Amino acid sequence: MENKLSFEEAISQLEHLVSKLEQGDVPLEEAISYFKEGMELSKLCDEKLKNVQEQMAVILGEDGELEPFTALGDEA
């Protein structure tokens, strides 16, 4: 799966695949291929969300409060 997709692009592709599968007129082999691709997109989205959660935890700090920003060398 292309990891360079943005979260929004991956969700859009996933929604498109789900829509195709929900129509119910997809041949079995094609449906399996769509399902596999959808699972990969789902995993990619999950990884991106976890990454954002980790970034937010760093930004907010352990107590959930916004940490003050200090520029490099600005240790006053």
Swiss-Prot record:
Q: Does the keyword Transferase apply?
A: no
- The EC number(s) attached to this protein equal 3.1.11.6
Q: Which UniProt keywords apply?
A: Cytoplasm, Exonuclease, Hydrolase, Nuclease
Instruction: Locate the transmembrane regions by residue number.
Output: none
EC primary class: hydrolase
Q: Which reaction does it catalyse?
A: Exonucleolytic cleavage in either 5'- to 3'- or 3'- to 5'-direction to yield nucleoside 5'-phosphates
Which Gene3D superfamilies does this UniProt record tie to the protein?
Answer: Exonuclease VII, small subunit
Pfam families listed in its UniProt record: Exonuc_VII_S
> Has UniProt tagged this entry with the keyword Lipid metabolism?
no
Compartment annotation: Cytoplasm
Q: Name one GO cellular component term.
A: exodeoxyribonuclease VII complex
Purpose: Bidirectionally degrades single-stranded DNA into large acid-insoluble oligonucleotides, which are then degraded further into small acid-soluble oligonucleotides.
- HAMAP family recorded: Exonuc_7_S (MF_00337)
Partners and quaternary state? Heterooligomer composed of large and small subunits.
Q: Which family does it belong to?
A: Belongs to the XseB family.
**Protein name listed in UniProt:** Exodeoxyribonuclease 7 small subunit
Gene coding for it: xseB
